[in-house]
Amino acid sequence: MMKMRWLSAAVMLTLYTSSSWAFSIDDVAKQAQSLAGKGYEAPKSNLPSVFRDMKYADYQQIQFNHDKAYWNNLKTPFKLEFYHQGMYFDTPVKINEVTATAVKRIKYSPDYFTFGDVQHDKDTVKDLGFAGFKVLYPINSKDKNDEIVSMLGASYFRVIGAGQVYGLSARGLAIDTALPSGEEFPRFKEFWIERPKPTDKRLTIYALLDSPRATGAYKFVVMPGRDTVVDVQSKIYLRDKVGKLGVAPLTSMFLFGPNQPSPANNYRPELHDSNGLSIHAGNGEWIWRPLNNPKHLAVSSFSMENPQGFGLLQRGRDFSRFEDLDDRYDLRPSAWVTPKGEWGKGSVELVEIPTNDETNDNIVAYWTPDQLPEPGKEMNFKYTITFSRDEDKLHAPDNAWVQQTRRSTGDVKQSNLIRQPDGTIAFVVDFTGAEMKKLPEDTPVTAQTSIGDNGEIVESTVRYNPVTKGWRLVMRVKVKDAKKTTEMRAALVNADQTLSETWSYQLPANE
């Protein structure tokens, strides 16, 4: 009788254990915290030289066999494909599948890939690992799986929604960006991906982050749609003190645009993944910072408490603004970060790096807290990242936003109607918005403007724009020293009512 009771209790315990087992971010956090208490071990490359030294064109020949997509034989709408190691993607990452009862390592096999003309010894690749992975989902049509997430290299990941193409990237963490000591790039060293059910519309991914001075545990919940939203939870532990911690970092590219035209003739009027930094400050102010490709490294810091959101946006999606049939910059998404909870005091920081071509990501934006805990203490950050082409929906409906910033030679119209340059620089800024379009065109809209010590506002005028049903600000400024940057701000008002976001522009140094 006692034996039967013991067996019954054992069976009940087994049933309870199996039904209540669940993998969570806490499992990853235990590993991250343990790593933080140990010395950093740099990842070791196991890559044969034929792959490590290959050119990009050769790396592109290594393709995943779509017929062997992970979960291909399951009814789940999500599928996984993997990246092969090659070039600077020379260290493997571990990838695991999480099911209802267990964690299973997804093992590398060269049979997953076709290698094109890349000559290699099959025995030398049989024990390699994956460089990263991608997620496929029928986001554009029910009968076709399209790539919606790519996790490859350091802590970078790219995400798109319906009708979008890859553009800017997000990252897990940034350390010492733009500091003289040099930037440290943490990397995701291991992933755990939950096997979704047939009816699931979201995919959960966990990641373990490691670097010389920080570790972290991450949970990403990917929700694909017209806008693909990624819900992020992170637990970060410092191994050692850092100069600057970048939370929810975004990385993009800006080469040229109307505010900074191409120095050489180019059939493309604009070339960028993003054209501005948008900030919703803790005090409710909306700020728009047009991007530059400066001649020298530029860092802009916007101090605040408890930010409500920030993002790198691609405003203005008419194909005629880009004219690029190959790279389709008009279809590249904006990324908007919405913090959850109070993030305290800190700054949204924008880093602009000089670049000569579009292959370099030269724009970085992130939140950096004023106070960091001692090494080993846990930091928690929760936020969502929305990848969207509907930039107006990322903005308050009752607040007008900057549709376009154009830079021109300043001039004055003479009595003979000929425009004569007067040594100034003109900025033409168009504001628009749902509520602004409802205003009568004779509304007495004016501009509140200011400029830093290195400049003088010669004239500013505001007039109704019947084409956009918004208002256009024209501001002519005189720069005192072209070797220095010049800061300026402007916002539209009607008496004591603020109508628009704040246009916050930095004119780069000319040399």
Curated annotation (Swiss-Prot):
Molecular function GO labels: carbohydrate binding; catalytic activity
The name on file for this protein is Glucans biosynthesis protein G
Family to which the UniProt record says this protein belongs: Belongs to the OpgD/OpgG family.
Record the organism. Escherichia coli O139:H28 (strain E24377A / ETEC)
What are the BP-aspect GO terms? beta-glucan biosynthetic process
Name of the gene this protein is made from = mdoG
S-S pairs: none
Q: Which UniProt keywords apply?
A: Periplasm, Signal
Q: In which pathway does it act?
A: Glycan metabolism; osmoregulated periplasmic glucan (OPG) biosynthesis
**Domain of life of the organism encoding this protein:** Bacteria
Q: Which parts pass through the membrane?
A: none
Q: What does this protein do?
A: Involved in the biosynthesis of osmoregulated periplasmic glucans (OPGs).
Its subcellular locations are:
Periplasm
Q: Does the keyword Heme apply?
A: no
Signal peptide positions are 1-22
**Major localization class:** periplasm
**GO CC aspect terms:** outer membrane-bounded periplasmic space
